[in-house]
Amino acid sequence: MRKIIVGSRRSKLALTQTNWVIERLRQLGAPFEFEVKEIVTKGDKIIDVTLSKVGGKGLFVKEIEHAMLNGEIDMAVHSMKDMPAVLPDGLIIGCVPPREDHHDVLISKNKETFANLPSGAIVGTSSLRRSAQILAKRPDLKIKWIRGNIDTRLAKLQNEDYDAIILAAAGLVRMGWARDVITEYLSTDVCLPAVGQGALAVECRENDEELREWLQKLNDVHTERAVLAERVFLQQMEGGCQVPIAGYAYIDDREDIVLTALVASPDGKEIYKETVSGSNPEEVGTNAAKMLIERGAKALIDRIKEEMNRQ
């Protein structure tokens, strides 16, 4: 029996996601033995700096992709939002399983909802996308950077100077913690999620036809199409981690893709937002980018990048 070595980051969430995919493949009767190999990525090592300052795409995937290209591992399960818009030659996304909840959530120390947080309340996030949208709706709140995996952030909320933190719902749901800790699910009108949020990407080598055939059985076409539209939009905007960019697509009753896309200034004072629909994921993503660029979003991105480079 062929042994499939699965690369994973060391966090509880990463290992939970990896084991979930392995379990699904076992249930389908995949003729493989599985072994998980833990890999430390650059993003895991740098925990005292915001992701936007570290810069560069693929902070949580590059080392894993190297291991795959070198034949040390055969596949890896990533959070889709960590995936760069373009994959290295020789690697592909073998499948996109059904999407988990796409929302961001607020977890507050005193169980106050977003609208009821007192003026001057300190909200923890390490995401420019989240902080920009939060400040756009509530400029009276204070943003304080917070890094670390989910358990670390939940501990910091209780023990440090935070009134609330914002996390992705999906990770909490996958860990089985959602019911115990979430104060409020934030609507996409308040906080549009990151591109790919809530979805997984199972990556493998392009020439591994046997494994690809089994991975395809886990693929969810609706999630795949929606996420493709989001990722095409992101690629066209050339934002990276240094710019507040958000995008969420779903499939409507007519099987059309409906994508809402957003670009903002870090202080939340400038926001460009468009909703585009259509049947072709690439066209929908491209059209959303075009509309935002025409309205001035590209000029904003260039300005943000210039300011980052000067720091």
From Swiss-Prot:
Name the EC number(s). Answer: 2.5.1.61
Q: Name one GO cellular component term.
A: cytoplasm
* Tree of life domain: Bacteria
Q: Which reaction does it catalyse?
A: 4 porphobilinogen + H2O = hydroxymethylbilane + 4 NH4(+)
Q: Does the keyword Transferase apply?
A: yes
Q: Which GO terms describe its molecular function?
A: hydroxymethylbilane synthase activity
Further facts: The porphobilinogen subunits are added to the dipyrromethane group.
Function of this protein? Tetrapolymerization of the monopyrrole PBG into the hydroxymethylbilane pre-uroporphyrinogen in several discrete steps.
Q: Which PANTHER family match?
A: PORPHOBILINOGEN DEAMINASE
Question: Subunit details for this protein?
Answer: Monomer.
What name goes with this protein?
Porphobilinogen deaminase
